[in-house]
Curated annotation (Swiss-Prot):
Belongs to the glycosyltransferase 28 family. This is UDP-glycosyltransferase. SUPFAM superfamilies: UDP-Glycosyltransferase/glycogen phosphorylase (SSF53756). It is a single-pass membrane protein.
Length: 529
C-alpha cells in the first residue's frame, strides 16, 4: 500500500455489543451505527439470546451474534426488585444496590468467553467495537486482541476525570452535584457517603475479582483517564461542566431523527384532542409499582384533576393486573374510599387513559402534554428535555437518582423520594410546575430544550470520533515496524507515573536547589563567622 493509493476513509466492520442492557442501552448505540453504515461501514450486532429484536428493525445490521443466554422472567423480576429495594440512606439498602449489580455482572464470564471466540475467528473479527457500559467484557477483549473500543455511558463515568469541585461520588451524591452551593458540612457528608458506598461494595469487588481469577484474568483497576473512547449520552447543562480528556466526549441527547406518530394510536390522539392539560405518567418497563405507591400516585393525580391543574392523565403501564388485586385488599385504601381505583385502572374514568404502550416521543411532543411524571431513566430524561416537557421526577435506582437531581438543579423539574412521598406532595408539585407563578420553569424548560436540540447533532461527532480512533489504531504499528505509537487522543500523563506526571521530581529538584545554598550559608555562618 502507498499513500497515494490508500483510501482516506475505507469501510470497516464495526461490532455493536449490548448484553444485559435493553432498549435504553441499545437505541443510542444503534443510532450511531446507522450513521456509520451510511458512511459505508458494515454493522454487526452482539446480544444475549432473546434480545435479537433490538436490532431486527434496523436493516443496516448485517448479522446478529448471540453471546450469552437470556435473563429468565424470574431473574429479571428478582433483579429489579433488588434495585427497587435499594436505598442509599441505610447500610442494607446500599448493599442491595451492589447485590443487583452482581447479578448484572454475573453474565460477564459467558459474554467474555463468547466474545473471545467470536473475535478469534478471522471471518468475524471486527475492526472496531462499540459497546454498552454493561457489556464490560469488551474492555477485556480490547486489551487482549488490541481491537479499538468505544463504550457508551448514559452519564459521566463515576471514577473518570474527577474534579475537586464535584463532591462525593459523581452520579451518586446525596444532595449536591457540585460544591458551589454546598456548605463544608454538606461536603463532609458527601465524602462520608463515599466511604459508606466503598464499604457496601466490598462483596461486589470480591465477586468481580473471583470471576476474573477463575477466567485467568487479573483485576482491572478503573482508570482516572480512559484508554478507550468514552461516549457520554448527556450534555453540559444537565451534567455539571468539567474538563474532559480527549477520549471522553458528551454526545447526547442521541435520539432518532423520526419517531412513531400519534396517529398509530387513535385512542390516545382523541384523548389529547379532548384534554388540553395532560400529565404523562411512565415508569419504564422494569420498575415494579407496589400497591401503596400506586395508591398514592392515583390519589395525588385525582387531587390535581379536582383542582384543575391538569385535566387528563395518560399512563403507560403494561402490567397492572396484580396491583389491582393488591389495591382491593390494601386496608389503607379504606381511608380514601371516594377514589375509585378499579374504575381508573379499568379506564372507566374519563380523566385517565391507562395503556400498555405509547409512542412516548409523540406524546411528549404534543401540545396538550404539560407535565411528565417519570422515573427519569436515561432515554426518558433525554426525551423530556428535548421535547420541552417539565418533569415530576420519581427516580428508583442507578442513574435515575442522579437524573432526578439534575433535572431539579436545571430548573426543569421537581424531585421526589419514591420511599416516602405523599399524595398531597405529588399534587402540590404538579400545581407548582403547572401554575409556574414566576415563569422560571417555562424559561428553563425552553433554555434546556434549545441546548439539547443543539447538542443532539453531536451523534455525528460520535461517528466522526469512532472513525478517527479506528483509523488511528490500525496504522499505529505494522508487521515491518516494531515501534508502535500511542493513541493520538490519549494524553501523555495516562502513560506516565503519577510522580512524574505531577512534576513532583521537578519540585524536589527545586527544593534541593534552594535548600543546598541556604544550608551552606547557614553552616558557614555557624562555623566560620
Amino acid at each position: 500500500m502507498t499513500i497515494l493509493s490508500a483510501e482516506r476513509a475505507p469501510s470497516r466492520r464495526i461490532l455493536a455489543v449490548v448484553t444485559v442492557g435493553r432498549y435504553t442501552c441499545a437505541a443510542p448505540i444503534l443510532e450511531i451505527c446507522r450513521i456509520l453504515h451510511a458512511r459505508g461501514h458494515t454493522i454487526e450486532f452482539a446480544c444475549l439470546d432473546g434480545h435479537q429484536g433490538l436490532a431486527t428493525p434496523h436493516a443496516f445490521v448485517s448479522k446478529i451474534h448471540v453471546v450469552g443466554r437470556n435473563m429468565t422472567v424470574e431473574e429479571d423480576k428478582a433483579l429489579y426488585r433488588l434495585f427497587d429495594e435499594s436505598d442509599a440512606s441505610n447500610a442494607e439498602g446500599r448493599k442491595g444496590t451492589f447485590r443487583a449489580l452482581m447479578k448484572f455482572h454475573s453474565w460477564w464470564p459467558e459474554t467474555y468467553r463468547n466474545l473471545k471466540a467470536l473475535v478469534s475467528d478471522p471471518a468475524y473479527r471486527p475492526d472496531f467495537i462499540l459497546a454498552d457500559l454493561l457489556a464490560d467484557a469488551c474492555i477485556d477483549i480490547m486489551n487482549e486482541f488490541e481491537i479499538p473500543l468505544a463504550v457508551h455511558y448514559p452519564q459521566m463515568p463515576i471514577q473518570m476525570a474527577p474534579q475537586k469541585y464535584i463532591p462525593g461520588m459523581p452520579g451518586a451524591q446525596l444532595k449536591h452535584l457540585s460544591s458551589e452551593h454546598a456548605s463544608l458540612w454538606d461536603r463532609l457528608q458527601e465524602e462520608y457517603h463515599v466511604l459508606q458506598l466503598i464499604f457496601a461494595m466490598k462483596d461486589y469487588i470480591l465477586f468481580q475479582r473471583k470471576m476474573r481469577r477463575e477466567m485467568g484474568l487479573g483485576p482491572r483497576p478503573p482508570p482516572r483517564k480512559p484508554d478507550y473512547l468514552v461516549l457520554v449520552n448527556s450534555f453540559f447543562g444537565l451534567e455539571v461542566p468539567k474538563d474532559l480528556p480527549p477520549l471522553m466526549i458528551p454526545i447526547g441527547p442521541v435520539l432518532a431523527d423520526t419517531f412513531t406518530p400519534l396517529d398509530t394510536t387513535p385512542e390516545l390522539l382523541n384523548f389529547l384532542q379532548v384534554h388540553r392539560k395532560v400529565i404523562y405518567v411512565a415508569f419504564g418497563s422494569h420498575v415494579e409499582l407496589p400497591a401503596w405507591r400506586v395508591r398514592r400516585l392515583i390519589k395525588g393525580l385525582v387531587q390535581a384533576l379536582e383542582s384543575g391543574d391538569i385535566d387528563g392523565v395518560i399512563w403507560a403501564w403494561k402490567d397492572r393486573a396484580s396491583v389491582m388485586k393488591d389495591l382491593e385488599s390494601d386496608p389503607s385504601s379504606i381511608d380514601d374510599a371516594k377514589v375509585e381505583y378499579s374504575a381508573i385502572l379499568d379506564n372507566r374514568n374519563e380523566g385517565f387513559k391507562i395503556v400498555g404502550w405509547v409512542p412516548q416521543r409523540a406524546i411528549l411532543d404534543h401540545s396538550s402534554v404539560c407535565l411528565y411524571l417519570s422515573h427519569c431513566g436515561a432515554s426518558s430524561t433525554m426525551e423530556a428535555v428535548y421535547h420541552g416537557v417539565p418533569v415530576v421526577a420519581m427516580p428508583v435506582y442507578g442513574d435515575q437518582l442522579a437524573n432526578g437531581k439534575r433535572l431539579e438543579a436545571a430548573g426543569v423539574g421537581i424531585n421526589m423520594n419514591r420511599k416516602n412521598f405523599t399524595a398531597e406532595e405529588l399534587s402540590a408539585n404538579i400545581k407548582t410546575l403547572v401554575r409556574d407563578e414566576q415563569g422560571s420553569f417555562a424559561r428553563n424548560v425552553l433554555r434546556l430544550q434549545r441546548i439539547a436540540t443543539a447538542n443532539s447533532r453531536r451523534k455525528y461527532v460520535a461517528a466522526d470520533r469512532i472513525e478517527e480512533v479506528m483509523y488511528d489504531a490500525e496504522l499505529l504499528s505494522s508487521d515491518e515496524a516494531v515501534v508502535s505509537r500511542p493513541m493520538h487522543l490519549q494524553t501523555p500523563d495516562s502513560r506516565m507515573s503519577w510522580f512524574k506526571a505531577n512534576n513532583l521530581d521537578l519540585y524536589l529538584v527545586y527544593i534541593a536547589l534552594f535548600a543546598v545554598p541556604v544550608g551552606a550559608v547557614r553552616w558557614i555562618s555557624n562555623n566560620w563567622l
